[in-house]
Amino acid sequence: MDWETLKTDCLACQRCPLHTTRHNVVFGQGVENAEVLFVGEGPGQSEDEQGLPFVGRSGQLLDKYLFAIDLDRASNCYIANIVKCRPPQNRDPLSLIHI
């Protein structure tokens, strides 16, 4: 499966109950063939609203840390979450949602 097909499949996914409450599917962001990958658990409210990973307070802190070690999500790393849709109230995903 190529990258665009994977992204298209994620954007259309309705395999678990999270698709009923999401605003956006939060796919990864950054360089697709990056040597450095950061993976979070699931998107929060800010990420769900913007459709981008790690854009809330945690993301702002992560960007500062990345800058300190000469990394950034636009040029040399990739940032994603295991779960692509926000669990309601930012709770842990249910076992139904786990892969």
Summary of predicted features, one role per range:
Residues 1-97:
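A polyanion-binding, active-site-adjacent surface
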